[in-house]
Design a protein with these regions (language model features):
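Positively charged n-region of N-terminal signal peptides that target proteins for export
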Residues: 1-7
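Bacterial N-terminal signal peptides
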Residues: 8-18
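Electrostatic cytochrome c docking/interface patches
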Residues: 16-35, 125
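Extracytoplasmic/secreted proteins, especially bacterial periplasmic and envelope-associated proteins
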Residues: 29, 33-36, 73, 77, ...
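The canonical Cys-X-X-Cys-His
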Residues: 37-44, 110-114
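Detector for the c-type heme attachment site
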Residues: 41-48, 65, 97-100
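Gly/Gly-Pro-rich "capping" loops immediately C-terminal to redox-active cysteine motifs
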Residues: 47-77
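Axial heme c-ligation environment in periplasmic c-type cytochrome domains
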Residues: 60-62, 81-108, 117, 122-125
Length: 125
């Protein structure tokens, strides 16, 4: 009986470690997705100062580190812009639609990543 309890506890511990590794992998995946698709305009730190943004750039990309502004945006609003592009939300046509390029799970990871950058939650809805 004691052996069975030890085996069960050991399995539970390894299961939790596996879950933690999965969450870590998801976070790393979201950061890599951000770096690949977003950082060119928004910058690695999400401040809207990526390498593609020059003095001649016609718009200023959103500063994801601005908690006051980011907290006004719902996750659904952000999802819409990422999936369908800027014009879908009356924003810049320079923000491309990524919905046919990255998965919905990746978009959800990006939203969590953006919330981590701003250290804020979005408005409901």
């Amino acid at each position: 009986m004691k052996k069975m309890i030890k085996i069960t506890l050991l399995a539970a511990v390894f299961g939790l470690v596996g879950l933690m590794n999965t969450e870590t992998a998801k976070a790393a995946g979201a950061a890599e997705t951000f770096k690949f698709y977003c950082a060119q305009c928004h910058g690695l730190e999400g401040k809207g100062k990526g390498p593609n943004v020059t003095k001649d750039f016609p718009v200023t990309p959103r500063d994801f580190s601005n908690a006051k502004e980011m907290s006004k945006l719902s996750d659904d609003y952000i999802r819409g812009i990422v999936m369908d592009g800027g014009p879908s939300q009356s924003k810049s046509p320079l923000m491309p639609p990524w919905g046919k390029t990255i998965s919905e799970a990746d978009v959800n990871g990006l939203i969590k990543h953006l919330r981590g950058i701003c250290k804020c939650k979005g408005k409901a809805g």
